[in-house]
Each structure stands twice: as structure tokens, then as C-alpha cells.
Swiss-Prot record:
Modified residues (Phosphoserine): 958
Taxonomic source organism: Homo sapiens (Human)
InterPro entries per the UniProt record, alphabetical: ATPase_P-typ_cation-transptr_C, ATPase_P-typ_cation-transptr_N, ATPase_P-typ_cyto_dom_N, ATPase_P-typ_P_site, ATPase_P-typ_TM_dom_sf, ATPase_P-typ_transduc_dom_A_sf, Cation_transp_ATPase_P-type, HAD-like_sf
Tissue expression summary: Expressed in airway epithelial cells (at protein level). Found in skin and kidney. Detected in prostate basal cells (at protein level). Expression is increased in benign prostate hyperplasia and tumor tissues (at protein level).
Lumenal topological segments: 124-146, 324-335, 808-817, 882-933, 987-1001
Top-rank EC class of the record's enzyme: translocase
EC number, UniProt record: 7.2.2.19, 7.2.2.13
UniProt cross-references to PROSITE patterns, sorted A to Z: ATPASE_E1_E2 (PS00154)
Mode of membrane association: Multi-pass membrane protein
Taxonomic classification: Eukaryota, Metazoa, Chordata, Craniata, Vertebrata
Protein name in UniProt: Potassium-transporting ATPase alpha chain 2
Transmembrane segments: 103-123, 147-167, 304-323, 336-353, 788-807, 818-838, 859-881, 934-953, 968-986, 1002-1022
Catalytic activity: K(+)(out) + ATP + H2O + H(+)(in) = K(+)(in) + ADP + phosphate + 2 H(+)(out); K(+)(out) + Na(+)(in) + ATP + H2O = K(+)(in) + Na(+)(out) + ADP + phosphate + H(+)
Length: 1039
């Protein structure tokens, strides 16, 4: 008979065709292609190459066909020679690491990004200005050369620092390498050998046992009770059985293939390697992350926006005054020098270093709070987050199944789900509990890994699946040494749990002093266990299982199931000694023992409980205007129960289904607007258009996506971003990588996360805790606030530095301040105070504000610019000019005499220039007085910048509400300002190249009234903002 050639089953492994898990009603999980997403991505990203197809038919082949295909022997394995040839041909069995940016490129990016460009332009303009001056005067001052060199040096030093910070985070990341197994047990040359897993090749025969990770894609040849955890690949949380049986066309669903890097939870398996390294399924998926581009961070956009503003203002003012200078009959070359001077005066030279240090300080603070920041700019992004799409397992929950409730003696008891299980309050004296605890202990294949004698019970590593681990630890805490109990009740026969039977059964020799007999114990799906029972134990005695007791059972079962908990039923049967003597041989294939008319003992339910810190964290998110969306592969009932327990769904919120149930009407009849919450399944999401998803995201504040695959996160993230939201996404699986890269900020789990997820993320949670994200949000908001304050502080003095050039050109005064003097303000006295603002504590309303809108709430907005430049900036300029005019008046030049004096003042051959009192001044004397004027203007700005620094501690609250001495680093900054000012004025007075002279002490106090005025003025501004929220004053004076 002609045999039809097996059809190759194509599995698309990308964010374009999704793998969606749906329940067909027969208990089997199905995966369906999400074509909508494919079309959207094709239209949107034009990335046909994003689709990668894996053609796999090995699961359909017989053992003989496999041997022929791979040239191997199932019993003897490959020869070492052949294995070496294949290794040379295919390369090592490891995933190619993501393409790394060369270190030199990373370094150069730090040199030319954001503020750096502005400083480089300033440096080149300085050199051009010197060139112009030198062309007409060979003895031209080298000030502009020095200024250009210093600006270049600032960029280089700051770039080195930023590069070092990011390299440090990268090095920490490289230490995470938990996903790939290191060793593999292989049969070669008829011998079992342990070799590095990287040396595996196709055709190798490998053996894997419970607790090991699968070292490659393998086709199962034989297995004993093997179950694997595929969650990092498919998002499937339930353990999946593995056998040599071909059960499904789809290789992702068939039982006879195990996938690279998934975990064997229990049992043993022997298999043939069919794919290695990048050719494995997980290798294909891991490569998808490179198909989704990194998005520019909000803070990078803000800095770019700020650079454009500063450059625009500088160039506009420069050109304006170039035109004025030319119209006032200045030489064109002189006018160009003025133009360059004005542009350079507008460049905030110290801000680049300040921003870099501020981001680094915050990153260090966050590392102490278990948030590892890979990209410094990601810190602020977290602060502007408006939607958090969070995993359930391990992030919102403790990532450990825990016994939550017990039902026996017709009562539901609440178990302690805290970290240590120490406070169990149910009745442990009941004889029914004694029987139930024995079943829980014996009908369990989980075991503690050896060598953990001193490790607390709840932290011990276990070989076994999550449910059995929960039962083992529960028994160990309450009953003591479980392994000792099992030794005393030796297991003589066992039927492992499987999806067909839906029960697990074991038979044990009893440690009965009155005579040996056998006890059969069973656990499994409650309805299946009840079917096998004719009696029920109540208060230690067996009673007939009648309709009344069955109804009580069903009520309890439905109540526990409705809580989203996984419920198991337990029963037992003492086998009669006369029918089953000590020498009896049990045969599990022949089933030569009874499996009906058993005694039902009780129910036990388990749940992965919420972390204790999460409800408070979710409440903080609500106050902060952040929408928290749960995205999980779990059952909708479980997801909804956890969402309610942590506050993602409020206690009084109802879904459409809840309303339908309450009113006893069909779901279609419910007005969707009456529902405040929504639980959307992956199956529903698969059939939704983008518009329908957008409608759900826009209309519901409380949303849970359940039964979704990790790939569907990409659709959800894109949907959120279409709402103009800044989206943070958590992920741990390989399949989460595209969503992590697409999100504004990707957050990987440090403990449970795969390497692919960590590589794609911007931030890694070292404790996998949702509360750490909220801490990060607060830190991110704080950094945005503090950057605003720093920029406002830095911009204020720009007007005071710019006005002297404008007055110099228009009014013709002797130059009030030189470019080198300005540099000492920007890179000397102001650097430490600017950095000190990074240490400022949060204002009281920081987590009660709505998230900032990325297109409207800018880092540098109109109120900030207007207030800094035209309010405080002009006050500073007036105060500094007051000191300048005071010095000149004291020396004999009254203000009216200085007007239009510039041309005569600067003539080298004029040595008899008369002041207001007729005294004659030589060129050298005038130059020394000019340097004294520089120093006076410098001191005037310095004194007022102290007041400016203090007022920048808050934007809304009074300084006295915030605490004047709460941030001690501010006072370090003020002290540094004064010390640097004193050193420049007195210690280096003889160094005329710096253009500073020794200043009389009284000149330091001339600007103090202006400094006090600045403080009082700002306190009044903040008072009116607090008194009249939403008013014109609030909108225009709150920056």
C-alpha cells in the first residue's frame, strides 16, 4: 500500500504569528496562529524577514527512520570521530549571543549624544573666533582657545564617566547565565559520558533526569514519568508529560519532543538530539528580539528637545545682536566675535556632567533597592510610565504554589500562606486530618535535593513540579521529616499522574505495629476522585457517601475553585490483609488491586499567593495615575482572583460576566459601560481587531489578560502605545523578548528570567518583585523633578552671563565679565550645587500626580524657561550689575561715564583716559580694573546662585515644608561655591591669565539684598500655586 509522505508541519516562531493557547474542552491545549498580528506587523514594520519558519517532522518518524536520518545508533550512540565532524560542521550547541555594539562605538556615542553636540559646537566656535581674531591681530588673547579646549575636555571626561557606568551594568548582566545547562550525559562509543552541553551534536543520544535542563531539542526515545516545564517557551504553567508517543501534528504540542533550555521536573528521559544551538526552536525565537528596534527613551527625547531650545535661543539672540552690532557700525569681524560669544554664553557647559552624574546616582540608589539599571536613561523612563503590563507569576505572586485551604470534616480551613507557613490554625487533632496528612505525604513524588540540611524548609530546592513541591513543604512544616515517614511506609507500587486518568495512586507497606497491611492512597481531580469513592471520612469515621454529603463536597469544591485555586481531592483504602498478604505482588498494568469503593478524606487547594508588598504597591500606582494591567498565561478565574487580591481589580468592580451572573442574563445583554473591569482571554484577543483592543484599553481602567501566550504581549504593548502611553513591561521567558524591546521600558526578572529576556530589557529586577517597580517609578519621577530643578538652576545664570555681552555691544560699557570667568561659574562654582540637587528628596505630592504626558509635560517647558530667564535670571543680572557698577563707581567711573566708553577703553595706545573725577587711567590700570569688574560680576552671580540653589529644592512646596537642612549635600554645594569663589578671588589673584583680582570684602555683600529678594519672590510664587491650584498662576508659574 502506498504510504503518503508525511506533511511537514510549519510553525511560525515570531511576534507575527502568535501561539495562542485555547481550551478545546477535551483538556488538551491548542495553539493557533494569530494572523491579524502578522498583517499588522507586516504593514507596520515591513519586516518580512521577521517571520522565521521551522520545518520539523522528526516527531513523526520511527526510531529506525531517525537512525537513518541522523546516521546514529540508538543503543551505541555516535562515535567520537563522527561527533567531532558534526561539531566542526554545525558549531557549538549554544545560542549566538545578541550582536553587540562595538565598545568603541558605544564610547563615541557618549561623545556625540545630547548635550555633547552643543558643547562640541561651542568649542569649535571658540576656536573659529580665535582664528578670526588672530587673522587681524597676531597678539590676540588665547582665552577662546582655552575655552574651546575646556569645553572639549568636559565632553570627553563626562563621556568616559557615562561609558564606565553603562559598562559596569553590562558586566553585571554578563554574570547572569542561569538558563543554559553546563553538562550533558551522552552515549558515545557505547559508553555513557558527561560532556559540556556545548559539545552536543545532532544524532547524540542523551539522558536527562528530574531537575536537569534539556540540553538541546531532543526527540524522546523512552521515558519514565517524565514531565517538563515549557513555560519559558510557551507560557504554559502546567507541567507537560513527555513520552515516545507521537500525539500531535504540531511539534510544539506532541509529547515526544523536549525543547532546549526547558526543565525536566521529574522522571527520566532518553532522547536523540535533533537540533542544536541557533537551530533549536528557542534559538529561532531568541533571534526575534533583534527584529524589534530599541525605542528612544523619553529622557533622550527630552534632552534632544532641550538642546534644540537652547541652540535655538542662542542662535536667535546671537544673530539678532550680530545685526544690531553691524547696524551700530561695528566691524563685521568684531560682530562675528560677538555672535560667537553670545552663543557660547548660552551653552550650559556644566549641565552635561550634571545630568550624567544624576542618572548614575539614581541608578546606584535603585541597585540598592533591587533594580539593576542597564541603560541610565531608563531610570527616568520608569518615572514617566503610565501603564505597567505585569506578569502574574513571580512578579505579583511569590512564584511558589502554596497550600491555601483545606476541606475535611465538612469544614473549610484556611492555611497560612505566609513565607514560612508557621502559623497554621486549622484543627490538627482531628483523626481525619491524620489520615489526610498521611495521603498528602505518601502520594507525592517530590523530594528535597540533597545537601540542604541547614536551609530553611520553605527555601529548600525540590525535584518535582510546583504542586507536589507545595504539598511536600506543607507536610514537612507540619509533620516533620517527610522522608523518614516515607521510609517507614515503603512504596510498593505506583501509577503516576497523567492527563487521561487525572489521578495519582501509590500503595505502601504500613508501619502498623499490629500487623503488616497495605494502604492505597490516591490524589487527583476532585470529581474523578469522588467517582471512585463510596464512603467519606468525617471526624475519623467512615460514613456512606450519600447525596447530602456529595452536595456538601460540591459546594466546598465550587467555593475553592471560585477563588481561583487549584483543588485536589484525596482518598485512601486499607487493603484487607487476607486478600493482600505481605508477599503479594502488585501489578500496575494488570491493576490487580481495587480502585473503586474508596474512602474520600478531603480536599486541599493551592494557589501561588500574592507577595505581601504588592497590594500597597498597586494602591500607590493608582494614586500616581498608573494603570496596572495583568498579563498571564493562567486560567481567567485564577488571574481574576489574584487581580482582586492585589487590587488590580477593585473589590466593588464588576466585569461584564459578573453583571450577567448577578442579573441572571446573557452576557450579550449587558451594557458594557456598566462594567468597570475586564478579563480578556487570549482566545478573545486572537479574534479582536486593533480597534476593538484599543476600545478595551481606553474604556477600562482595570484589565486582566488571561490565557495569553508571551507573544501576545507584543500586541498588548503596541495597543497601549497607540493610547500615547509610556509602557513598562515585565517578562521572564524567551518569548517575552520582542515585547520587552518594543516597550518604552522592558523589565526582566533577575531570578526567574531567561538570558534572552535580560538581554532585551532595560532594567532587571533582582528580587522579581512588583513592589520594586513602584519604587523605581518613584525614583524615576524624582529624577525628572530633580533634573528640572537642575536645569532651572543652570539656566537662570545664563541671562546674567548673557546680559553683559548685550550691554557691551549696545550700550558700549567696558566688558562686565569675560568668557573664562563664565567658565569658572559653569564648571567651577555651579557643578557641585547642580549635582547636589540630585540628592534632593521627593516633594510630598510626587506619587499623587498623574504620569507626565510625554508630548506635553516637557523637561524644559515654557513656564520653566520664562521663570528662569525672565524672572530669576533678570533679578540676578540686575544684582550682578549692581556689584559691577559699585566697583567702578568706587574707583571713579560713575555709570553715566561708562556709557559708550568701550571703544576708547580698549585702545592700547590710550594711556590718559579720564574717569568721572578727571583722573587719568593707563591701559594697564584700565585692564586691571576690568578684571576687578569681572571678579565683582562673578561674585554677584555667585551670591545670588546660592539663593537660586535653595529655592530650587522645591517646585510647589515651601522650603520650610521640605526642610532647609534635609538635603545636607546642598550645603556641601553652597560651601564649595564660597570656597571656590574665595580661592579664585584671593588665592589665585596673582594669576592674571584667569582674569581674577583680589576683591574688597564689602563687595561680597552688595548682592545679598537681591539674593533675599529672589528667595522671598519664589516663596510667594509657591504659596499662590498651592492656594490657587488650576488657576492662571498655577499654569504659568509652576514649572
Amino acid at each position: 500500500m502506498h504510504q503518503k509522505t508525511p506533511e511537514i508541519y510549519s510553525v511560525e516562531l515570531s511576534g507575527t504569528k502568535d501561539i495562542v493557547k485555547t481550551d478545546k474542552g477535551d483538556g488538551k491545549e491548542k495553539y493557533r496562529g494569530l494572523k491579524n498580528n502578522c498583517l499588522e506587523l507586516k504593514k507596520k514594520n515591513h519586516k518580512e524577514e521577521f517571520q522565521k519558519e521551522l520545518h520539523l517532522d522528526d516527531h513523526k518518524l520511527s526510531n529506525r527512520e531517525l537512525e537513518e536520518k541522523y546516521g546514529t545508533d540508538i543503543i551505541m550512540g555516535l562515535s567520537s570521530t563522527r561527533a567531532a565532524e558534526l561539531l566542526a560542521r554545525d558549531g557549538p550547541n549554544s545560542l549566538t549571543p545578541p550582536k553587540q555594539t562595538p565598545e568603541i562605538v558605544k564610547f563615541l556615542k557618549q561623545m556625540v549624544g545630547g548635550f555633547s553636540i552643543l558643547l562640541w559646537v561651542g568649542a569649535f566656535l571658540c576656536w573659529i573666533a580665535y582664528g578670526i581674531q588672530y587673522s587681524s591681530d597676531k597678539s590676540a588673547s588665547l582665552n577662546n582657545v582655552y575655552l574651546g579646549c575646556v569645553l572639549g575636555l568636559v565632553v570627553i571626561l563626562t563621556g568616559i564617566f557615562a561609558y564606565y557606568q553603562e559598562a559596569k551594568s553590562t558586566n553585571i548582566m554578563s554574570s547572569f547565565n542561569k538558563m543554559i545547562p553546563q553538562q550533558a550525559l551522552v552515549i558515545r562509543d557505547s559508553e555513557k559520558k558527561t560532556i559540556p552541553s556545548e559539545q552536543l551534536v545532532v544524532g547524540d543520544i542523551v539522558e536527562v533526569k528530574g531537575g536537569d535542563q534539556i540540553p538541546a531539542d531532543i526527540r524522546v526515545l523512552s521515558s519514565q514519568g517524565c514531565r517538563v516545564d515549557n513555560s519559558s517557551l510557551t507560557g504554559e504553567s502546567e507541567p507537560q508529560p513527555r513520552s515516545s508517543e507521537f500525539t500531535h501534528e504540531n511539534p510544539l504540542e506532541t509529547k515526544n519532543i523536549c525543547f532546549y533550555s526547558t526543565t525536566c521536573l521529574e522522571g527520566t528521559v532518553t532522547g536523540m538530539v535533533i537540533n542544536t544551538g541557533d537551530r533549536t526552536i528557542i534559538g529561532h525565537i531568541a533571534s526575534l528580539a533583534s527584529g524589534v528596534g530599541n525605542e528612544k527613551t523619553p529622557i533622550a527625547i527630552e534632552i534632544e528637545h532641550f538642546v534644540h531650545i537652547v541652540a535655538g535661543v542662542a542662535v536667535s539672540i546671537g544673530i539678532l545682536f550680530f545685526i544690531i552690532a553691524v547696524s551700530l557700525k561695528y566691524q563685521v569681524l568684531d560682530s562675528i566675535i560677538f555672535l560667537i560669544g553670545i552663543i557660547v554664553a548660552n551653552v550650559p557647559e556644566g549641565l552635561l556632567a550634571t545630568v550624567t552624574v544624576t542618572l548614575s546616582l539614581t541608578a546606584k540608589r535603585m541597585a540598592k533597592k533591587n533594580c539593576l539599571v542597564k541603560n541610565l536613561e531608563a531610570v527616568e523612563t520608569l518615572g514617566s510610565t503610565s501603564i505597567i503590563c505585569s506578569d502574574k507569576t513571580g512578579t505579583l505572586t511569590q512564584n511558589r504554589m502554596t497550600v491555601a485551604h483545606l476541606w475535611f470534616d465538612n469544614q473549610i480551613f484556611v492555611a497560612d500562606t505566609s513565607e514560612d507557613h508557621s502559623n497554621q490554625v486549622f484543627d490538627q487533632s482531628s483523626r481525619t486530618w491524620a489520615s489526610l496528612s498521611k495521603i498528602i505525604t505518601l502520594c507525592n513524588r517530590a523530594e528535597f535535593k540533597p545537601g540542604q540540611e541547614n536551609v530553611p524548609i520553605m527555601k529548600k530546592a525540590v525535584i518535582g513540579d510546583a504542586s507536589e513541591t507545595a504539598l511536600l513543604k506543607f507536610s514537612e512544616v507540619i509533620l516533620g521529616d517527610v522522608m523518614e515517614i516515607r521510609k517507614r511506609n515503603r512504596k510498593v507500587a505506583e501509577i503516576p499522574f497523567n492527563s487521561t486518568n487525572k489521578f495519582q495512586l501509590s500503595i505502601h507497606e504500613m508501619d502498623d505495629p499490629h500487623g503488616k497491611r497495605f494502604l492505597m492512597v490516591m490524589k487527583g481531580a476532585p470529581e474523578r476522585i469522588l467517582e471512585k469513592c463510596s464512603t467519606i471520612m468525617i471526624n475519623g469515621e467512615e460514613h456512606p457517601l450519600d447525596k447530602s454529603t456529595a452536595k456538601t463536597f460540591h459546594t466546598a469544591y465550587m467555593e475553592l475553585g471560585g477563588l481561583g485555586e487549584r483543588v485536589l481531592g484525596f482518598c485512601h483504602l486499607y487493603l484487607p490483609a487476607d486478600e493482600f498478604p505481605e508477599t503479594y505482588s502488585f501489578d500496575i498494568d494488570a491493576m490487580n488491586f481495587p480502585t473503586s469503593n474508596l474512602c474520600f478524606v478531603g480536599l486541599l487547594s493551592m494557589i501561588d499567593p500574592p507577595r505581601s508588598t504588592v497590594p500597597d504597591a498597586v494602591t500607590k500606582c493608582r494614586s500616581a495615575g498608573i494603570k496596572v494591567i495583568m498579563v498571564t498565561g493562567d486560567h481567567p478565574i485564577t488571574a481574576k482572583a489574584i487581580a482582586k487580591s492585589v487590587g488590580i481589580i477593585s473589590a466593588n468592580s464588576e466585569t461584564v460576566e459578573d453583571i450577567a451572573h448577578r442579573l441572571n442574563i446573557a452576557v450579550e445583554q449587558v451594557n458594557k459601560r456598566d462594567a468597570k473591569a475586564a478579563v480578556v482571554t487570549g482566545m478573545e484577543l486572537k479574534d479582536m481587531s486593533s480597534e476593538q483592543l484599543d476600545e478595551i484599553l481606553a474604556n477600562y481602567q482595570e484589565i486582566v489578560f488571561a490565557r495569553t501566550s508571551p507573544q501576545q504581549k507584543l500586541i498588548i504593548v503596541e495597543g497601549c502605545q497607540r493610547q500615547d502611553a509610556v509602557v513598562a513591561v515585565t517578562g521572564d521567558g524567551v518569548n517575552d523578548s520582542p515585547a520587552l524591546k518594543k516597550a518604552d521600558i522592558g523589565i526582566a526578572m533577575g531570578i526567574a528570567g531567561s538570558d534572552a529576556a535580560k538581554n532585551a530589557a532595560d532594567m532587571v529586577l533582582l528580587d522579581d518583585n512588583f513592589a520594586s517597580i513602584v519604587t523605581g517609578v518613584e525614583e524615576g519621577r524624582l529624577i525628572f523633578d530633580n533634573l528640572k530643578k537642575t536645569i532651572a538652576y543652570s539656566l537662570t545664570k545664563n541671562i546674567a552671563e548673557l546680559c553683559p555681552f548685550l550691554i557691551y555691544i549696545i550700550v558700549g560699557l567696558p566688558l562686565p565679565i569675560g568668557t573664562i570667568t563664565i567658565l569658572f561659574i559653569d564648571l567651577g562654582t555651579d557643578i557641585i550645587p547642580s549635582i547636589a540637587l540630585a540628592y534632593e528628596k521627593a516633594e510630598s505630592d510626587i506619587m499623587n500626580r498623574k504620569p507626565r504626558h510625554k508630548n506635553k509635560d516637557r523637561l524644559v517647558n515654557q513656564p520653566l524657561a520664562v521663570y528662569s530667564y525672565l524672572h530669576i535670571g533678570l533679578m540676578q543680572a540686575l544684582g550682578a550689575f549692581l556689584v559691577y557698577f559699585t566697583v567702578y563707581a568706587q574707583e571713579g567711573f560713575l555709570p553715566r561715564t561708562l556709557i559708550n566708553l568701550r571703544v576708547e577703553w580698549e585702545k592700547d595706545y590710550v594711556n590718559d583716559l579720564k574717569d568721572s573725577y578727571g583722573q587719568e587711567w593707563t591701559r594697564y590700570q584700565r585692564e586691571y580694573l576690568e578684571w576687578t569688574g569681572y571678579t565683582a560680576f562673578f561674585v554677584g552671580i555667585l551670591v545670588q546662585q546660592i539663593a537660586d540653589l535653595i529655592i530650587r529644592k522645591t517646585r510647589r512646596n515651601s522650603i520650610f515644608q521640605q526642610g532647609l537642612f534635609r538635603n545636607k549635600v546642598i550645603w556641601v554645594g553652597i560651601t564649595s561655591q564660597i570656597i571656590i569663589g574665595l580661592i579664585l578671588s584671593y588665592g589665585l589673584g596673582s594669576v592674571t591669565a584667569l582674569s581674577f583680582t583680589m576683591l574688597r570684602a564689602q563687595y561680597w555683600f552688595v548682592a545679598v539684598p537681591h539674593a533675599i529678594l529672589i528667595w522671598v519672590y519664589d516663596e510667594v510664587r509657591k504659596l499662590f500655586i498651592r492656594l490657587y491650584p488650576g488657576s492662571w498662576w498655577d499654569k504659568n508659574m509652576y514649572y
